[in-house]
């Protein structure tokens, strides 16, 4: 999931350009992965693909919003035609939506691993409810640390879900093909969580962008060619 939005101070132009390019690439790749997984789900009727595809739906939505906000920043609309209070409101809304969509993406990944134990459980209702609570908490607190802690907690839950699923289904051919995808997603989220640390030099951020794009491209290759 993307890091929370930058405070209302115009960042360097190269930073905005890199962020916009990065966000657009991730959004487009997520759209392709989502479309392919929906096709596989319709052909196989395997519910795990439905939940897993929603991971990339919400991840793509998060990066699409970030791309739009960054374009507004680059054009100067937000900084020249909107008051400071209005700008803060837009940033707060963006942070809340990113917290919601990013949390929903991780929760859908977790549920795609555990749904066979929770078939009678209203999983999607709970996923959206928990994501909404995280978003509202981030909005009301206005503290990036709250967002960071919530995402770290969800990522650790993902690790636990991977181990639980692996211990029961590691001999299934479908599961064997899926585990590398989950591990790559774990790496992707760790890389993006590290972007919430504002003290990172631009060179480090650009390196993380490059690694993140490489990881999501590998995921796309495995989904588009091997599923």
UniProtKB/Swiss-Prot annotation:
It comes from the Archaea. Its main location: membrane. It is a multi-pass membrane protein. The chain crosses the membrane at residues 15-34, 55-77, 92-114, 121-140, 145-167, 180-202, 206-224. Keywords: Cell membrane, Membrane, Transmembrane, Transmembrane helix. GO terms for cellular component: plasma membrane. The keyword Transmembrane applies. The keyword Ubl conjugation does not apply. It is found in: Cell membrane. This is Uncharacterized protein AF_1460. It comes from Archaeoglobus fulgidus (strain ATCC 49558 / DSM 4304 / JCM 9628 / NBRC 100126 / VC-16).
């Amino acid at each position: 999931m993307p890091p929370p939005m930058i405070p209302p101070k115009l960042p360097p132009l190269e930073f905005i350009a890199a962020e916009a390019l990065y966000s657009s690439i991730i959004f487009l790749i997520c759209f392709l992965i989502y479309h392919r997984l929906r096709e596989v789900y319709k052909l196989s009727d395997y519910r795990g693909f439905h939940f897993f595809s929603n991971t990339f739906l919400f991840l793509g939505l998060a990066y699409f919003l970030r791309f739009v906000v960054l374009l507004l920043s680059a054009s100067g609309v937000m900084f020249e035609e909107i008051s400071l209070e209005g700008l803060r409101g837009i940033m707060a809304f963006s942070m809340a939506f990113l917290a919601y969509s990013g949390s929903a993406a991780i929760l859908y990944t977790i549920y795609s691993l555990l749904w066979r134990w929770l078939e009678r459980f209203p999983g999607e209702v709970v996923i959206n409810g928990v994501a909404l609570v995280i978003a509202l908490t981030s909005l009301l607190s206005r503290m990036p640390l709250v967002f960071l802690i919530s995402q770290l907690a969800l990522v650790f839950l993902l690790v636990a879900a991977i181990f639980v699923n692996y211990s029961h289904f590691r001999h299934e051919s479908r599961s064997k093909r899926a585990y590398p995808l989950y591990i790559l997603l774990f790496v992707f989220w760790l890389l993006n969580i590290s972007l919430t640390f504002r003290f990172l030099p631009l060179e480090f951020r650009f390196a993380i962008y490059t690694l993140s794009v490489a990881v999501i491209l590998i995921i796309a290759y495995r989904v588009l060619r091997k599923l």
